[in-house]
Amino acid sequence: MRAVCRRFGKSTVAFYGKEKKRLRKAVDTDCVVRRVNAVRMELPFLGGRKTFHLVKQALANDGVKIGRDKFFEILRKQGLLIERRRAFVPKTTKFDPSLPVSLNLVKDIVVDSPNQVHVSDITYIKVGSNYAYLSLVTDRFCRDVIGWHLSGSLKSSGPIAALKMAAKAVPSGTSVIEHSDRGCQYASKAYRKLVSRLGFRSSMTEERHVYENAAAERVNGILKLEFALDRCFRTFSEAKRAIREAIESYNTKRPHEMLGMMTPTQARANPALARPKALRAFESAKKASQRSAARRAAARKAA
């Protein structure tokens, strides 16, 4: 080896140093791939930043010193970056002008604790050649799904069943704001009667616009695109089983940047730890909503 190094004008120290570095890089890459694949076994479509948060301590324990940029470079080279998907979304909001509409009670409030505001929405689930409809109730602060129901129709019975489930997670005597879009299911007499009987308050978007119920829409997207609920299920029971498992994993395993990389379950158990990051996120979202409203108002005025 000395003769070869002399022939090419290299020292053996430089040669072995370079070889050691190459081997170290290969070992580090192998560790990263192994740790990422372990996470993806449970959260197959989790994005890179959240995956890095989940594996960085384990990598440190493995002796791998790596920053986020290098981590993303390895994911890219190994074909492990997640490509965001979009799917066709059938309309699930049906507005009935004959039904009463609640005021938007959440527009200007700061949500800083669990059981303060729930956001509700309905999203489609493909079952065979038909659609089923998933009603969800999510806590606005800690982002956990606390109520859900899969129905074969868009009747109000779906949101009512989801709300009944959600109510079981709320301490007795707590007056929660139940926020939703203006869909006829949420404006129905039966749904509003249940909200009142539970001691909750009804709130609705002022406009039929997704920005005014963005938190609920976001959860829909996460469950579909990160937990594969956008696929076509063979049977209704298969869909229900997949939804139950997806919600359990979402609540207990998926970190949220808006919660300081805590899971929804962790945020509910330790709201004080999640609050600083959550409040900054709420303020940022509020400003974005105000800018969006101003643009829409300007567009209407120009028209």
Task: Show the residue positions of the predicted features.
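Basic, flexible linker segments flanking DNA-binding modules
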Residues: 9-114, 209, 265-277, 285
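Short small-residue beta-strand/loop micro-motif enriched in glycine and branched aliphatics
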Residues: 17, 144-148, 202-205, 229-230
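C-terminal domain-tail junction helix/linker
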Residues: 196-198, 222-303
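Mobile-element integrase/transposase regions
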Residues: 68-136, 158-162, 169-175, 289-303
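A short acidic/small-residue loop/turn micro-motif
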Residues: 139-140, 150-155
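Mobile genetic element proteins and their domesticated derivatives, centered on retroelements
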Residues: 4-8, 15, 36, 51, ...
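RNase H-like two-metal-ion nuclease catalytic core shared by retroviral integrases
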Residues: 94, 180-182, 188-195, 202-224, ...
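K/E-rich alpha-helical interaction surfaces of small helical-bundle regulatory domains
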Residues: 2-22, 44, 242-261
